[in-house]
Amino acid sequence: MTDADPTLRPDPLPEDNDRALRPQALDEFIGQAEARANLRIFVQSARQRGEAMDHTLFHGPPGLGKTTLAQIMARELGVNFRMTSGPVLAKAGDLAAILTNLEARDVLFIDEIHRLNPAVEEVLYPAMEDFELDLVIGDGPAARTVRIELQPFTLVGATTRMGLLTTPLRDRFGIPTRLLFYTVDELFEIVSRNARKLGAPAEEAGAREIARRARGTPRIAGRLLRRVVDFAVVEGDGRITRELADHALTRLGVDQLGLDGADRRYLRLIAENYSGGPVGIETLSAALSESRDSLEEVIEPYLLQQGLIQRTPRGRMLAQKAWTHLGLDAPRPPGQSDLFG
């Protein structure tokens, strides 16, 4: 297996929308303790004051719960939840249609907000600051600006690329919240709970095996769990043991660190063809027939987080942990002789 496994990628898949597995309240949400504690304060304050909660920006790697937290916020505020995404809002009129239909204190969630059209973003500024919408009607000399009053609302933005947000947009969010990768213990809790909901109870060692290979991401943990449940039903007795989880995940090409075929191919290329690096990203892109964006956004973040690779001014290099994981010996630096040589 050499291709990127969709199961191990944090991007959403249709099967991720299983409402039964999603937490419905902050108390049910596992992980992100600091973010949850702060959000609980902000939600309670907004409810007691009877005002719209301040605009909130969730940023961090994909699959960590940004959409789920936004839905929980709306539920705990007792208001409606509207959802869209940056690429969908092609024209200012698209955004205006959504904003003018919001009721007082509603939550509007914009996923991938870093991909907003600049013209749409300009319309968003007065809407966020003054709850007003300035629309241009007509063309040429006959054009005129119409100001529309909006109901106070809460904008919740989500981005995986904080650096791509313009400064004016970023500064208009009063509650910036970074979401972090989950610990194995947190993922273990999530896997154990969801296994019970799926009717395939997991032994502690079985749930922990799935958690260890889930790349710190609940979305991936949920997908791996579903696949392991399939194996438990067909090849086992319906229970998830450590042996069954290990067997199923190995069959799926997921190794002990949660790497898939594409990850291992990336590491092995640097090890075998470039002596561990440094090697430039463009060279890797050509050798792997992958786009640079795909390498930088999909494959490299987890390898960096695990300390398997290093980014240097001269290119990518393998860390000692990667050599060990591949079962290869790292080459000696040039000019370094053997201890007894």
Swiss-Prot record:
Secretion signal: which residues?
none
Name the positions where ATP binds.
Answer: 21-22, 63, 66-68, 129-131, 172, 182, 219
Location, primary (coarse class): cytoplasm
Which residue intervals make up region (Large ATPase domain (RuvB-L))? Answer: 1-182
Q: Which reaction does it catalyse?
A: ATP + H2O = ADP + phosphate + H(+)
* EC annotation from Swiss-Prot or TrEMBL: 3.6.4.-
Q: Name one GO cellular component term.
A: cytoplasm
Q: Where in the cell is it found?
A: Cytoplasm
Give positions of region: Head domain (RuvB-H).
256-341
Q: Which UniProt keywords apply?
A: ATP-binding, Cytoplasm, DNA damage, DNA recombination, DNA repair, DNA-binding, Hydrolase, Nucleotide-binding
Q: Which residues does the annotated region (Small ATPAse domain (RuvB-S)) include? A: 183-253
Cross-referenced InterPro entries: AAA+_ATPase (IPR003593), AAA_lid_4 (IPR041445), DNA_helicase_Holl-junc_RuvB (IPR004605), P-loop_NTPase (IPR027417), RuvB-like_N (IPR008824), RuvB_C (IPR008823), WH-like_DNA-bd_sf (IPR036388), WH_DNA-bd_sf (IPR036390)
GO aspect biological process, one term: DNA recombination
Which positions bind DNA? 292, 311, 316
Domain remark in the UniProt entry: Has 3 domains, the large (RuvB-L) and small ATPase (RuvB-S) domains and the C-terminal head (RuvB-H) domain. The head domain binds DNA, while the ATPase domains jointly bind ATP, ADP or are empty depending on the state of the subunit in the translocation cycle. During a single DNA translocation step the structure of each domain remains the same, but their relative positions change.
Describe the task this protein carries out: The RuvA-RuvB-RuvC complex processes Holliday junction (HJ) DNA during genetic recombination and DNA repair, while the RuvA-RuvB complex plays an important role in the rescue of blocked DNA replication forks via replication fork reversal (RFR). RuvA specifically binds to HJ cruciform DNA, conferring on it an open structure. The RuvB hexamer acts as an ATP-dependent pump, pulling dsDNA into and through the RuvAB complex. RuvB forms 2 homohexamers on either side of HJ DNA bound by 1 or 2 RuvA tetramers; 4 subunits per hexamer contact DNA at a time.
Q: How does it assemble?
A: Homohexamer. Forms an RuvA(8)-RuvB(12)-Holliday junction (HJ) complex. HJ DNA is sandwiched between 2 RuvA tetramers; dsDNA enters through RuvA and exits via RuvB. An RuvB hexamer assembles on each DNA strand where it exits the tetramer. Each RuvB hexamer is contacted by two RuvA subunits (via domain III) on 2 adjacent RuvB subunits; this complex drives branch migration. In the full resolvosome a probable DNA-RuvA(4)-RuvB(12)-RuvC(2) complex forms which resolves the HJ.
**Which family is annotated?**
Belongs to the RuvB family.
Report the HAMAP family cross-referenced here: DNA_HJ_migration_RuvB
Q: What is this protein called?
A: Holliday junction branch migration complex subunit RuvB
Q: Which organism is it from?
A: Ruegeria pomeroyi (strain ATCC 700808 / DSM 15171 / DSS-3) (Silicibacter pomeroyi)
